[in-house]
Amino acid sequence: MKPNTSGGRRYLIVFCFAVILSLCVLAAINELEFDSLKKLGKCAFSNPPPSGNSSTTNATFAAGGDDDEIRILIGILTRPDSYDKRHFLRLIYGTQSPAPGARIDVKFVFCNLTKDDQRVLVALEIMRYGDIIILDCKENMDNGKTYTYFSTLPELFPGGDSSPSPSPSPPYHYVMKADDDTYLRLENLVESLRPLPRKDLYFGYVIPCPSMDPFVHYMSGMGYLISWDLAEWIRDSEIPKKNMVGPEDKLLGEWLRDGRRAKNRFNGKWSMYNFPEPATQCTHELWPETIAVHLLKTQEKWIRTLEYFNVTVNLKPSKLYHIP
């Protein structure tokens, strides 16, 4: 009697097919894992985490990289001990959407440290955020701090051929001085600057409040911008050095007047204004076209302002929290 070889042969074929199928599945899985790891590796090298030593910060907003981008430095003048205010403002500006076609760097500016706790805590902030500029001056409001800020910028950010590493020239088209009780809407700021000249420019909220003529007096210290060439002029000219004591915003207007500078002046009213309450000639209701809201001296005023502009609209749903 012949052995039944057809059944064994059929079993062998099925077994071989199963082995081949298993190998194909394993190969496909390995390929997927490899692709995932490769993508992860690319992500890790293309988007390194921010370093505390970087010149940009968590409060840096960039969109696009062409030569037409607007580069703005916002210097928020504050004091070394204002830790809570700085952390709060990092939230405010760090969660705003990037303005298309613009690069905005937000820095906190104050004078020399004077206490041991400042030397530790401010150093930790710099290591973590890299968004602090410490000027070589004694802390003050109207005794030369703003002059030191503007005149120091060309040395801090040389740009172009003067920079040790490749960088745009000028490093910023506009530099801004802002108060720490001012809320800035960055995208609206960029859109207001986009059609304007990038040299010999002075932009802000004209003082006195009823005035609409930017050539008569000066711009409010709530937040004003000058073009980079004017910061260089402030550094080099003798005019500011002879007139440094007094209200800083008024002094800047006098420097530019005496130096016959800032031929391009633009009034930011009424997109820049004081908080609606108490009502004065400098206030009006909050509105969507806002560039700056000033005199946010209390948390209640900040919250009312942030609620109006719906700053949490991009909060994503998650099982980790429930916010009504």
Question: Across the structure, where does each feature detected by a protein language model lie?
Answer:
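Secretory-pathway lumenal glyco-enzymes, predominantly type II signal-anchor Golgi glycosyltransferases
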Residues: 1-324
